[in-house]
Design a protein with these regions (language model features):
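Non-catalytic N-terminal regions of enzymes
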Residues: 1-124, 155, 161-213, 276-330
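Helical lid/core segments from catalytic subdomains that handle acyl or acyl-like groups
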Residues: 204-271
Length: 330
């Protein structure tokens, strides 16, 4: 019998708030095997019975599992590829790695250290409203596409280890260059950096994520971004979607595109595992521009992703922007 209690969640209801991790397990897993492992995981977590495993062509599976509402966990299988889709109210990015470990029966660990005892920004809500009125965050020049439903995705691999600071710096440079080439301003580039608090042994899965938010990054050098990232407080203005976020309670629908950030960046760190290869992480597309940049390192390679709303971006345009980010890492 499930002791499931749905977590409180105040996130933008226009999106599904699902975080995704795809990988290629070392041992080929059938949909039936994955379903059985998921059933056991749901029982362990006290979650309701899981939905059926989604199967089909890889891109279609990714799109489908990204749009399921409220269900804690949805899994997809396409050939050798396994896709984990979790509702962010129940699971954070590091939790996706725990799920992969449970499904494969092999340990999956990350170098990510979390936010530690970093202080919170007590003036977050007031400061964010002032920002909306006086200096809203920069947008990203949109492509001309045929609008579609749901989200669009792009991924590519780069050699070596990529640090979060380097990724933020490269993303800012790519956005500024894109906007400049299209005659758009890039004043007040704001990056929300996702972070987490690693679980202690025996803890159930939960959303332990936090946000660190940096502004006016178009004015900062790489070393200055590194310093700012180390010193910045935790963002308390409700950007994570948790029900306790003050802005989420009264301004989210009217001001979502201005309350958010130019880009969300979330790095799962260097992952160590023999369970699977090519781990690929897609953070949520919430607030601001609706663009999120994900990263995860494994076996000397870092997979970068971009995710955006298909009403504004398609895979090709996201891929072009992601290539610009990757080029600025070298």
């Amino acid at each position: 019998m499930s002791d499931h209690v749905r977590p409180s969640w105040g996130g933008d209801p226009s999106i599904a708030w699902r975080i995704l991790l795809s990988s290629v397990p070392r041992q080929l897993l059938s949909a039936e095997t994955v379903a059985e492992h998921q059933r056991v995981l749901h029982e362990t977590q006290g979650w309701p019975a899981p939905p059926p495993v989604v199967t089909g062509e890889a891109a279609a599976v990714l799109r489908e599992v990204a749009e399921v509402r409220d269900v804690p966990l949805v899994l997809g299988v396409s050939g050798a590829q396994l896709v984990v889709s979790a509702f962010h109210a129940y699971v954070d990015g590091l939790g996706l790695l725990e799920i992969l470990a449970a499904l494969t029966g092999q340990p999956v660990t990350s170098s990510a250290r979390g936010v530690g005892d970093r202080r919170a920004d007590g003036g977050g809500a007031v400061d964010r409203l002032r920002e909306v009125a006086l200096a809203p965050p920069a947008s990203v020049a949109l492509p001309t596409i045929i609008a579609a439903e749901g989200d669009a995705f792009a991924a590519l691999s780069v050699e070596g280890r990529v640090l979060t600071t380097d990724l933020v710096h490269a993303a800012v440079a790519a956005i500024v260059d894109r906007n400049t080439s299209r005659g758009r301003p890039s004043d007040h580039v704001a990056i929300a950096v996702g972070a987490g608090r690693p679980a202690t042994p025996g803890e159930r899965l939960a959303n332990r994520s936090e946000l660190i938010r940096l502004r006016d990054l178009e004015l900062l050098s790489l070393s200055e971004i590194e310093t700012a990232l180390r010193a910045a407080p935790l963002d308390t203005a409700g950007g994570s979607g948790a029900a306790g976020g003050r802005l989420a309670r009264y301004a989210q629908k009217a001001l979502a595109s201005r309350l958010g950030s130019t880009l969300l960046v979330s790095h799962l760190g260097e992952v160590t595992t023999t369970a699977a290869s090519v781990p690929t992480f897609y953070p949520v597309t919430a607030g601001g521009t609706g663009l999120s940049l994900g990263a995860v390192g494994h076996d000397g390679t870092t997979v970068l992703t971009l995710r955006g709303r298909a009403a504004q971006w398609d895979g090709s345009s996201l891929g072009a922007l992601l290539t610009q980010v990757a080029e600025r890492l070298t």
